[in-house]
Amino acid sequence: KDLNHEISIVVINDASSQQIVDTYPNIENINSIEIVNMKENRGHARCIASGLKYIFEKKEFDFVIPMDGDGEDRPEEIKNFIELSKQNSEKSIVGERVKRSEGLIFKVCYQFHKFLTLAFTGKSIKFGNFTCLSKITVKKMLEEKATWSSFSGSLKKVENDLLSTPSIRGKRYVGPSQMSFFNLLKHFLSIISVFRKTVLIR
């Protein structure tokens, strides 16, 4: 609410067959809603990369805000991105997780994952997909092949000077969180692969 900006939504459907409620409250700020259907679910990174490619090639925009549509990325935090983007129109912004909704054991494992990522790559990555990307950054991301396998790793690789804003992980609208220990391990390895040359040197 109360956003003096033109916002368009592009939904990338990752081949989901789950039924959704097609009522949309509080859409007075929304200029358009478009759904792009993927033929098969190829994972978060490829889904986001496909969305970025589609928007870059077919839309006019100043910023793109990739986010999960399951509630874990809270829509109310979009205003924080917009306010911060006014300060610098060329820098991209990341939502740094300050609070997670999973159990204690998973939170400990997640902190360990962040420590190992820093130890192996020399990069501190405290963000996920929920970001606000400038047009310049989107172009850089699409030129980086690793974007199709690791969004956060590739963003950290192509942009060293990122702004940040606190982000609280929300609760899913439907069902439990999909981030299992196995998925966390895959996430860690995908980031490591982005910086594999650095890892070998270290």
Label the predicted regions.
Residues 2-4, 27-32:
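Short helix-capping segments at alpha-helix termini
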Residues 5-16, 36-38:
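Short beta-strand/loop segment that forms part of the nucleotide-sugar
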Residues 13-21, 40, 71-72:
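A conserved acidic beta->alpha catalytic loop
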Residues 39-40, 44-54, 63-66, 75-149, ...:
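Acceptor/aglycone-binding surface of glycosyltransferases and processive sugar-polymer synthases
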Residues 8-13, 63-69:
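Extended hydrophobic secondary-structure segments that form protein cores and membrane-embedded regions
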Residues 26, 152-202:
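Hydrophobic helical membrane-anchoring modules
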